[in-house]
Amino acid sequence: MQLEHCLSPSIMLSKKFLNVSSSYPHSGGSELVLHDHPIISTTDNLERSSPLKKITRGMTNQSDTDNFPDSKDSPGDVQRSKLSPVLDGVSELRHSFDGSAADRYLLSQSSQPQSAATAPSAMFPYPGQHGPAHPAFSIGSPSRYMAHHPVITNGAYNSLLSNSSPQGYPTAGYPYPQQYGHSYQGAPFYQFSSTQPGLVPGKAQVYLCNRPLWLKFHRHQTEMIITKQGRRMFPFLSFNISGLDPTAHYNIFVDVILADPNHWRFQGGKWVPCGKADTNVQGNRVYMHPDSPNTGAHWMRQEISFGKLKLTNNKGASNNNGQMVVLQSLHKYQPRLHVVEVNEDGTEDTSQPGRVQTFTFPETQFIAVTAYQNTDITQLKIDHNPFAKGFRDNYDTIYTGCDMDRLTPSPNDSPRSQIVPGARYAMAGSFLQDQFVSNYAKARFHPGAGAGPGPGTDRSVPHTNGLLSPQQAEDPGAPSPQRWFVTPANNRLDFAASAYDTATDFAGNAATLLSYAAAGVKALPLQAAGCTGRPLGYYADPSGWGARSPPQYCGTKSGSVLPCWPNSAAAAARMAGANPYLGEEAEGLAAERSPLPPGAAEDAKPKDLSDSSWIETPSSIKSIDSSDSGIYEQAKRRRISPADTPVSESSSPLKSEVLAQRDCEKNCAKDISGYYGFYSHS
């Protein structure tokens, strides 16, 4: 009972004050607006209000519209609010509708109405360009209109922030944004009379669907590429529209106009004006949506996307292609959306102002460029545009700076700790420069997620020519030098000099190096003639190596060198024939799988340089001379030839520096029996 007692006043308030006057001739539109958005109003105030008028405001964040009566009606409203406590309840309900204070949204009305001829049309947060406005009807006394999406309405509803009177007729000029200290008046898009007080504009509301993405670019001043062939916009324009007559027919199109009178250039890491814009450019500036003309029900049913709109600097493109919008480089532009009601035969009638509506979203401003200037914009395009592979592959060669200090990092940025699998691979400072660890893709360390730049994968900079580059598998013949990630001479996988313990040393290092192999990476099979064919992986078998008897490996004694390993050229040839993935590298395979303890390497003498020139590398590196398709990418090792051995891929200065520091002539044959003793006894 108490709950009903508390709710009944608010229910009665909603019934009394959520009514739209039936005296308005366009009742169908009012019902549609009432259905879509909550409107709080009184009905008796319409009788004594001056002729039809309305002021609305399109907001950028929390969108709402405040309708105010004429200034001469304000004392009456104050008196009625004193007499009736019900109105106070309405005011409280209206002020706390979205849980915000009233002073955040409600702006006081100017007591000195401006002249109708000088009141410009304004739009939050920038002044906008619209056609001449006309008096629209007022639903009643001070009320508020709450919308739950970013909304910028027609020019006829945007005079609140410019302090124009409710009866004001905003001029047709375009007050451009004042943030750079310039004011520029442009011509209206539609020329029609502004002296028809009986006509009422439509109440269409337009929502910018991908507004969060636009705002992210707008923070750094959006740039759009223009080419001779035409380049599509990204982000593209995508809208949702409501409030149209479902049975009427409309043309919806976009035009692109100059946003200010300046010519711009990128200097000192920011855009600065330099001279006046060229306003005498000829060319198409309008892009009609392919679905035009169509019914209001069609336009309101789905998202209206302009993804096929192309920007070009070819002035002759307008002669043969309606999809091209001709722009000039280094000029700032503002796209506008136009909704025009047409006749049944498709002809436009712009003599009636209610048929033409223009919508402008300031966050869609951009500067036309022939090449991206701001690296922040480049990074955002890489992160969000699925078709940015063209310059994503070459990003590290153009922009080699560190991306870790960017203001807008990619959501898929990997931390620096993922570049090196663990503390065991502590690198010298010269090997781990900032330009090599820039924004490395997470997918490179998780093969199950896919490493390619195809749709549906994490998109980031693959660093084709950078550090830890697995892209070499796609282009094994790339002539550019590779920067190989190698371990220091005293830190060869940090194997202990005393013993090889499966649980502590070998398994620990292998798990650190190949911690993601469980996602589907196969081990390198090491089968040869006379063996069982069971592959020897880099990990301990789940059943344990100790469970296998020595006779399993060709019946050899524990601690001795296995005869099935290729210690001769004939055995190497047999192994290469049995396993095509080894090929010419089978010759030094035994030495590859026998890392030396640091103590044993001191007194070793060189026996065969070809057997001693293998060094351990992280599994994410793909060897240049490898021909496999990536299945064994994480399992192969990189063979580094000595400095005096001429090889085709030894052109990297970084590699030569490393080889000079290492003693490449250490022999690992002494410890080979101890190495295989690990497989037999552990």
UniProtKB/Swiss-Prot annotation:
Outcome (variant: residue 542 to R): In IDDAS; uncertain significance; does not affect nuclear localization; no effect on transcriptional repression of FEZF2; does not affect homodimerization; does not affect interaction with FOXP2; does not affect interaction with BCL11A
Compositional bias per record (Polar residues), positions renumbered to this chain: 58-68, 462-472
GO molecular function (one): DNA-binding transcription factor activity, RNA polymerase II-specific
Modified residues (Phosphoserine): 410, 594, 641
Record keywords, A-Z: Autism spectrum disorder, Disease variant, DNA-binding, Intellectual disability, Nucleus, Phosphoprotein, Transcription, Transcription regulation
Tissue-by-tissue expression: Brain.
Phenotypic consequence of residue 228 to E: In IDDAS; de novo variant; localizes to the nucleus but forms abnormal aggregates; no effect on transcriptional repression of FEZF2; does not affect homodimerization; abolishes interaction with FOXP2; does not affect interaction with BCL11A
GO biological process, one term: regulation of axon guidance
Pfam families per UniProt: T-box, T-box_assoc
InterPro entries assigned: p53-like_TF_DNA-bd_sf (IPR008967), T-box_assoc (IPR032385), T-box_DNA-bd (IPR046360), T-box_sf (IPR036960), TF_T-box (IPR001699), TF_T-box_CS (IPR018186)
Subcellular localization(s) per the UniProt record: Nucleus
Gene3D superfamilies xrefs: Transcription factor, T-box
Annotated DNA-binding residue span(s): 213-393
GO cellular component entries: chromatin; nucleus
Residue ranges, annotated region (Disordered): 43-83, 108-127, 447-483, 588-658
Positions of post-translational Phosphothreonine modification: 408
Record's compositionally biased regions (Low complexity): 108-122, 619-629
Disorder cited: Intellectual developmental disorder with autism and speech delay: An autosomal dominant neurodevelopmental disorder characterized by varying degrees of intellectual disability, autism spectrum disorder, and language deficits.
Subunit annotation: Homodimer. Part of a complex containing CASK, TBR1 and TSPYL2; may modulate gene expression in response to neuronal synaptic activity. Interacts with FOXP2. Interacts with FOXP1. Interacts with BCL11A.
Known function: Transcriptional repressor involved in multiple aspects of cortical development, including neuronal migration, laminar and areal identity, and axonal projection. As transcriptional repressor of FEZF2, it blocks the formation of the corticospinal (CS) tract from layer 6 projection neurons, thereby restricting the origin of CS axons specifically to layer 5 neurons.
Name the record gives this protein: T-box brain protein 1
Native source species: Homo sapiens
Phylogenetic classification of the source organism: Eukaryota, Metazoa, Chordata, Craniata, Vertebrata
